[in-house]
Amino acid sequence: MSQWGSGAILVQPDSLGRGYDGDWHTAVATRGGGVVQLNLVNRRAVAFMPKVSGDSGWAVGRVSLDLRMAMPADFCAIIHAPALASPGHHVILGLIDSGYRGTVMAVVVAPKRTREFAPGTLRVDVTFLDILATPPALTEPISLRQFPQLAPPPPTGAGIREDPWLEGALGAPSVTTALPARRRGRSLVYAGELTPVQTEHGDGVREAIAFLPKREEDAGFDIVVRRPVTVPANGTTVVQPSLRMLHADAGPAACYVLGRSSLNARGLLVVPTRWLPGHVCAFVVYNLTGVPVTLEAGAKVAQLLVAGADALPWIPPDNFHGTKALRNYPRGVPDSTAEPRNPPLLVFTNEFDAEAPPSERGTGGFGSTGI
């Protein structure tokens, strides 16, 4: 990798290493703001063997892109559909870490009886994005004296509680730490864990960490739930992992909540959304499995990607409609106009194993997370 410079991205279509014409036609494109993409379209019929097929009419499966990549630590790859949506099926937005060395997979949702994609009908884009390693700036814990309704339930309580701000209880304009008191059109489950504490300012709460620290090779910060959350069959649940808000003066960075490859492949889709400053984090989990699924306490359910302010303009804020998990992103939104900090150089190679730098992650999992 060093011979190409620190900003190089190594790419090896599997067909290069095997000496044959592969299943995918791959082209390089430069989008607005200097963003670099790979545009893939299947040149042959591609088999589709779904692992999840409930009674929703949809099947979920993984499709190999016959591609391996090695990126600098300050880059990730976004797997998504092209702007022109393919008819009848959906490429679920995915996130690839810089340390992943295995074959890249796309998670595809297709009509239940689909078993292959005819030549030229499956199109997938890989967008390379420079990211920030700085964790998001969050507000301080909330005082129980100000908001006694946030006191955690007794140990014998009923478990998950609906977030109280949906009822407008925290909308007092005179309190600077009040959560946004606007409705989002559906119920929302607070999945954090609160512990009462004594502080120099009086009674308060300590909230368990909802956004885990990330390693150098990780693209995003894992988002965990601290209580069990059940997503109904063929339905949705809006999850709020923390009571903390993103600081209003968070700077030029933008925070995006994206799904995890392992959950996407199981038919539990996180609707991509942008987390706006001054708001709490909330996102939709859409269950296509046909049976209720419980996310256990401590489960990693989504990822928080911190990037430039205009990095992903096609991911809207407050994206709280479950069916939008099946939307092909991007659609109808102009390209980014922000210049990447370090525009990447794509290098195609047939000596990937020899030229790619070592990685802690290796070939584990199939993209952003392990299975």
UniProtKB/Swiss-Prot annotation:
EC number per UniProt: 3.6.1.23
Gene3D superfamilies from the UniProt entry:
2.70.40.10
Enumerate the residues binding substrate: 260-262, 366-367
Catalysis: reaction(s): dUTP + H2O = dUMP + diphosphate + H(+)
Q: List the disulfide bonds.
A: none
- GO BP annotations listed: dUTP metabolic process
Q: Spell out the molecular function terms from Gene Ontology.
A: dUTP diphosphatase activity; metal ion binding
Q: Where is the composition biased (Gly residues)?
A: 362-371
Q: What does this protein do?
A: Involved in nucleotide metabolism: produces dUMP, the immediate precursor of thymidine nucleotides and decreases the intracellular concentration of dUTP to avoid uracil incorporation into viral DNA.
Q: Which HAMAP family match?
A: HSV_DUT (MF_04031)
Report the family membership.
Belongs to the dUTPase family.
Instruction: Supply the name of the protein.
Output: Deoxyuridine 5'-triphosphate nucleotidohydrolase
Q: What is the species listed in this Swiss-Prot or TrEMBL entry?
A: Human herpesvirus 1 (strain 17) (HHV-1)
